[in-house]
């Protein structure tokens, strides 16, 4: 496909984006808004953002959800801006500095919350800064400006949603159904690999792919939930399927690890059974029916606990899968599965990374303020706004440097494109609303195609071009003002990029160590006799941390294996019949406190000391378990956990 070619699958969204822009433009001028540009810009960003992230037309519900987040972020930012102005209107410099800190604070929060919701906080940060900068000449008009900005943004969002509904957005339901079938086959094939006990790298690749696919399925569930309320039952089932899929991965990998020391546990009966290849979900269904008969014949005692647990989870997966595909009423058996255990939320391991993002945003905004005050440039305020926008949006993504480069390319492309519209097209079409709408529709159509290709600079070019062309009411054509705005955007992006390069993010290793220690803490916390604590479902949170570890350290197999081993230890100890008595309960509470100290330790010396204390306590715990005559289901996992922690002691404690 050529660089300027147009694929058929890209046309519908390009028309949708053009329609959203035209609707916002028409409504803005029809209701005599002072700056219809904000409505048009909002419609373009809300519609194009999900398409750029997806690399194609977004699924149904994505644009609505992004619009909802934008409304929330705008209102939070407007309220914060009003509070800052009311409190500090007599000290303008201090007011701007507080706004810079507010933008940094919002970036800090957006780095810690779910990536889907971080957009609202990033927006809240720079909205307050936009309000404070814009009202500098006339502070008394602050409430009016805040109300107008909110109104224009809501109009833009409504127009984007109307355009999305008008062109029948894609439903993700069929993709979910296909992935459920395919994922079950992949789970069975992973178990086959683990029972064969072949090449470790092949097994590592297989379970790593399954972790990614399960995480992707969870993202599809979020999309389906946004799409329509009629998928509420399917959403409940998919949430339980996420845990079941992770359970299947855990049991398969434990089957592989058990054979490293005790290969005789997997009998020839099961080895021969899992030799039969499967290609479809129907093949897996037949094999599971046969496998349940084999287990009924051999008995639960003669069946390895990992295979028994795997079959139980796969059977539940199958039952819920049928319910998701048909979206029928939830029956009593499904309801029993769905009641399940409450999921546990873990503390973010990226606090240091979030603090780096705070300083990047705050320092870049302060640098923009100093540049504005030092030069006295009329468009210094525009540069400041772009600095806040770039840093607020870039920091929450995995590669902020590339986001900043995208904005630089976009603002550079917007200069000639905006010049064409400012000097030629808009002056010749402003007398006709139809011609004006057609001219902007053409811009939206072609940039909409490039956005779907994820072309570098396409998203920045769309937003920057709309921002600098004259879409005010009434239209005024001052070339110096246009040039200032265009250059202000470029300078702001370059300054933001400079700060991102200078304030380096060296938090990766620290985040990795915190994640690994959180796995250790989870394994230790499973040693409890508290019934409520044992019913807590840690699995989704643990695999979410594992997925983050895989993204932070791609290809680092030793780290992945260590994390997976800790997850397996957690699951095994959680189900182990630990003797119930006050002595063990008190000692396990002490061990959990020590594990928490390992995570929270700020220096290597403290971390080593607490980790050494944890190892000593694990040795004492093994002795106590022998005294209290704990069964092998308890002593063996504790012994394996202690051995793993001794082996990887330096990796878990040293910076």
Curated annotation (Swiss-Prot):
The chain crosses the membrane at residues 13-33, 38-58, 69-89, 93-113, 121-141, 152-172, 370-390, 407-427, 431-451, 459-479, 482-502. Residues 1-12, 59-68, 114-120, 173-369, 428-430, 480-481 are periplasmic. Keywords: Cell inner membrane, Cell membrane, Membrane, Transmembrane, Transmembrane helix, Transport. It is a multi-pass membrane protein. GO terms for molecular function: transmembrane transporter activity. GO terms for biological process: carboxylic acid transport. Residues 34-37, 90-92, 142-151, 391-406, 452-458, 503-655 are cytoplasmic. Its main location: membrane. It is found in: Cell inner membrane. The keyword Cell membrane applies. Induction: Positively coregulated with aaeA and aaeX by AaeR. GO terms for cellular component: plasma membrane. InterPro entries: PHBA_efflux_AaeB/fusaric-R (IPR006726), PHBA_efflux_pump_AaeB (IPR023706). Belongs to the aromatic acid exporter ArAE (TC 2.A.85) family. Forms an efflux pump with AaeA. Could function as a metabolic relief valve, allowing to eliminate certain compounds when they accumulate to high levels in the cell. PANTHER family: MULTIDRUG RESISTANCE PROTEIN MDTO, P-HYDROXYBENZOIC ACID EFFLUX PUMP SUBUNIT-RELATED. This is p-hydroxybenzoic acid efflux pump subunit AaeB. It comes from Escherichia coli O6:H1 (strain CFT073 / ATCC 700928 / UPEC).
